[in-house]
């Protein structure tokens, strides 16, 4: 009988511990999950140029100029490239395209292209840029160029998009938003030309994926 009592007491202690530690474990797990969410998102500001940034951040003029210039260089490297001005204008609108420097990430696909001089490709103008803290907690700032179309027929019309076609809402500088940290990561260099309308298709696909992800997240949170 003594042995039976000791077994029951041990079982009781085990069950009591499980019942009372479970909420604590859940609370700890929740804290870690929230911490993970905080680390995966970042608040960024959207500016059209260095002057906009400087006006919004007194005393940070040098940082704003550096971020803007870095964004321009990144735009040259990652922006969609077109073989002709007409293809670029059809996507982004009149007055929204410029010749791309020959060294801006493009590799000649054939001998004819290799013989062409600087400016043989066309790319959209940088419409603005995102600016946020460096990943890893550095003291500097990270930046990401943004593009926008003025052609009403384009899926990128009136929107800020990055080089991959991801949509960041209306092309209105001076606002802040929360984005995944991956949004500020460097994008791959553009090494081939885009066909007419190709970038718009990328924007449309990305927008569909974003809406789908948002809907799935809302349903999950709603149970």
Swiss-Prot record:
**Record GO cellular component, one term:** cell outer membrane
Bias category Low complexity: which stretches? Answer: 178-195
Where does this protein have compositionally biased stretches of type Polar residues?
Answer: 204-223
Superkingdom as given in the UniProt entry: Bacteria
The molecule here is called UPF0441 protein YgiB
Task: Report the coiled-coil segments.
Answer: none
- Which residues does the annotated region (Disordered) include? 178-223
**Sequence similarity:** Belongs to the UPF0441 family.
| NCBIfam families attached to this UniProt entry | PRK11653.1 (NF008655)
Please give the biological process terms from Gene Ontology that the record holds. single-species biofilm formation
């Amino acid at each position: 009988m003594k042995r039976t009592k000791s077994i029951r007491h041990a079982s009781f202690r085990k069950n009591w511990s499980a019942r009372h530690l479970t909420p604590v474990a859940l609370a700890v797990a929740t804290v870690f999950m929230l911490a993970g969410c905080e680390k995966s998102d970042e608040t960024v500001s959207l500016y059209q140029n260095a002057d906009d940034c400087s006006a919004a951040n007194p005393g940070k003029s040098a940082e704003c100029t550096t971020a803007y210039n870095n964004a321009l260089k990144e735009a040259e490297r990652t922006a969609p490239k077109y073989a002709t001005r007409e293809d670029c204008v059809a996507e982004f609108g009149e007055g929204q395209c410029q010749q791309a420097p020959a060294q801006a990430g493009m590799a000649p696909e054939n001998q004819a292209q290799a013989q062409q001089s600087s400016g043989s490709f066309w790319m959209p103008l940088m419409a603005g840029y995102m600016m946020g803290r460096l990943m890893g907690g550095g003291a500097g700032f990270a930046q990401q160029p943004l593009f926008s179309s003025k052609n009403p027929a384009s899926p990128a019309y009136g929107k800020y998009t990055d080089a991959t076609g991801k949509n960041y809402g209306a092309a209105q500088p001076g606002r802040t938003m929360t984005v995944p940290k991956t949004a500020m990561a460097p994008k791959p260099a553009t090494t081939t030309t885009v066909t007419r309308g190709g970038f718009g298709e990328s924007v449309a696909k990305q927008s569909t994926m974003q809406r789908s992800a948002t809907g799935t997240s809302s349903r999950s949170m709603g149970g």
